[in-house]
Swiss-Prot record:
This is Bifunctional protein FolD. InterPro entries: Aminoacid_DH-like_N_sf, NAD(P)-bd_dom_sf, THF_DH/CycHdrlase, THF_DH/CycHdrlase_cat_dom, THF_DH/CycHdrlase_CS, THF_DH/CycHdrlase_NAD-bd_dom. The gene is folD. It comes from Neisseria meningitidis serogroup A / serotype 4A (strain DSM 15465 / Z2491). Belongs to the tetrahydrofolate dehydrogenase/cyclohydrolase family. Pathway: One-carbon metabolism; tetrahydrofolate interconversion. One of its GO terms (molecular function) is methylenetetrahydrofolate dehydrogenase (NADP+) activity. It catalyses: (6R)-5,10-methylene-5,6,7,8-tetrahydrofolate + NADP(+) = (6R)-5,10-methenyltetrahydrofolate + NADPH; (6R)-5,10-methenyltetrahydrofolate + H2O = (6R)-10-formyltetrahydrofolate + H(+). NADP(+) binds at G166, A167, S168, S191, I232. The keyword Signal does not apply.
Amino acid sequence: MSAQLINGKEVSQKRLQAVAEAVAQRQQDNLHMPCLAVVLVGGDPASAVYVRNKKTACQKCGIKSLSYELPESTSQEELLALVDRLNADSEVDGILVQLPLPKHLDSQAVLERISPDKDVDGFHPYNVGRLAVKMPLMRPCTPKGVMTLLEAYGIDPKGKKAVVVGASNIVGRPQALELLLARATVTVCHSATENLTDEVAGADILVVGVGIPNFVKGEWIKPGAVVIDVGINRLDDGSLCGDVEFETAKERAAMITPVPGGVGPMTIATLMENTLHAASLHDA
């Protein structure tokens, strides 16, 4: 039996439509138009594509977008000065610095310079900390997008065994906090985890984000599990694949996200939701 596909494109379009309707209502109520500032440093082709996708989503939602494309040679001081200006600009609701930054720049210092109420990526330690103490403000986009997908497909994590493979600051750690908030019993696996196959085999809900093509094998997966593949990897032939061996996994899982078309669209939809939320925080 083949798994039901979890369609992130479809769910994300509904969420974007809801944001667009909320933005239109704000205009009727004479509230300011939400505004997202996106900063891109250097010429990384993948980053340029991601930034373009975010601009397109802003247009669909009626969110104003400002774009700052800086040369590879930009210094730490110059980048921090731009963040300071955007923090001080009352018209800007959200600030996004596209990662990865060139190697000579300190990404963590830049992320921590963004005002937490404008941190629409949800990466600032303040926002991760609020999520940890069950008081979320700006929630990291990919983990929150995963939770939205689960909700859309009627999957309640409460009481389930959830296993997160990968412990990055962007996906794995905040994903574990999101699942904990939803009252799942959460295990996080990382490079020092022993018996990874056993951990995966016990998962009712499996979320994988390690950036290694086909890392999790289909035969490891518990029959009837829900599999969320956050990975997106480009192979030598130009095709995209996730971190889970899709063809074998779909024969065991009850539901699974495809790559592409699963989690990716949800990340951008959540970014738009966060920008709208930031605008509402700035209304007062």
